[in-house]
Amino acid sequence: MDTQPIVLVITDSVTLHAAIVSWGLQNFQVKAEDLHVITQADRLEGKLNLKSSSLDAVVSISALHTQQWLLELARVLRPGGIIVLQNPNSVNDDVKETLSALERILLLAGFVLSEGADGSIDGLGPLAVKGRKPAWDTGSSFKLKKKVAQKPANVVTFDIPAFKVQLGDDLDDLIDEDSLLTEEDLKKPDLPPVDDCEVGKAGRKACKNCTCGRVEMEEKQEKLGLPSDLLDNPQSSCGSCGLGDAFRCSTCPYKGLPPFKLGEKISLSQSFLTADI
């Protein structure tokens, strides 16, 4: 019956120092027939002729650990198996940098970092890093525990008193809105008369039954003796005609009119158009 190795020590070198083999036997507490050694691993092209999950531990001694190589080591390791990476070219000056690089590549390959390896190997210096393959494997499954539904605790309820509003009792207290209006409020406002006189060729002209006040305005214009163009576009040679009678001369054509702005139509108020008694 073909038995698979339990511990594997693999290196790129042609030979392996006997101290490394002794360290592996002592550290992993295995028999000599259970520890296998592979040299010149760089010729394997990243593939091991081993079954998946067949090793308990792997010690890899190489100056260059690639991501592909670590994934292959992870394949042959059992869940929970130990992996030790060693860079034989490391010196005391760059130990920290080497450790950091090896730890990083271990994590990227899916391993979990473990405590640092103790002791040293003759001729190679201290072991670099020690990791462990997670205790689960691809395709593994486990049952999820369902939470038992708990009975709801006793809920204390309170009866909220309800208040009913009797609308019929307050109807007598309502105030009539019309009673708040006075006689002055009820009177219709005096709206300004609408100019509805006929429009002829010379402009608007008071009709026979004029109610808008145009008759009175025309009578006032005739009384003042001013043509319509002077009322529509008042002008002044002295500049004081629009200021009022106090500033007008005795011959001013606008004498008797209220103050106005030059160039703007003179608007006569209703009180001004009322005929003098």
Curated annotation (Swiss-Prot):
The keyword Mitochondrion is annotated on this UniProt entry: yes
Keyword Glycoprotein: no
Region (Fe-S binding site B): 238-252
Renumbered residue ranges of the record's region Linker: 141-186
Comment block on domains: The C-terminal domain binds 2 Fe-S clusters but is otherwise mostly in an intrinsically disordered conformation. The N-terminal domain has structural similarity with S-adenosyl-L-methionine-dependent methyltransferases, but does not bind S-adenosyl-L-methionine. It is required for correct assembly of the 2 Fe-S clusters.
Subunit relationships: Monomer.
Protein name, UniProt field: Anamorsin homolog 2
Species whose genome carries this gene: Picea sitchensis
Phylogenetic placement of the source organism: Eukaryota, Viridiplantae, Streptophyta, Embryophyta, Tracheophyta
